[in-house]
Amino acid sequence: MRVMIVEDQTMIRSLLESYFRAEDGYRITASLPGAKQAVEVCRTNSVDLILMDVQTENRENGLTAVRQIKAIQPKIKIIVVTSLIDCAVLDEAKRAGADSLWYKDSTQKRLMDVVRQTMAGEHIFPDAPPTVEIGMAKSTEFTKTEL
């Protein structure tokens, strides 16, 4: 399976690459820091799966890229990856045409499960963002406006 990773943080991008290299059947065809680059690569290259960060290099919007990629290559499966805890990201990812969403604070096993399920035609979206600590409080203790 041909995989593209779109993530602006070099360390996270390298970690995601290592996850796929550790599994049989995956080949990383592109690993990019920017969403615009991903759209261009999809115009000329065959890709089966994309892991797309919500906000990439130069503040490029990954969800905009999801829309553009789905318009030119609708069969490509796209998993949005994010660390944002905003509930709106879930809805925006669905509206953009993403096939699934995975939170970066989750495990390698969970990511690979989401990949397998997505490639099997399932759509995996968490019911809610993860709970994170913000100072001495938890994110669930704040309103959407306060977050």
Functional labels for PLM-detected ranges:
Residues 88, 106-115, 119, 123, ...:
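C-terminal output helix
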Residues 10-30:
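Two-component/phosphorelay signaling modules centered on CheY-like receiver
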Residues 51-66:
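Conserved phosphotransfer microenvironments
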Residues 31-49:
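Acidic, metal-coordinating helix/loop segments flanking the phosphotransfer/catalytic sites
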Residues 7:
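Conserved acidic carboxylate
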Residues 132-147:
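Helix-turn-helix DNA-binding segment
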Residues 40, 63-75, 95:
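Short amphipathic alpha-helix used as the core "switch/output" element in two-component signaling
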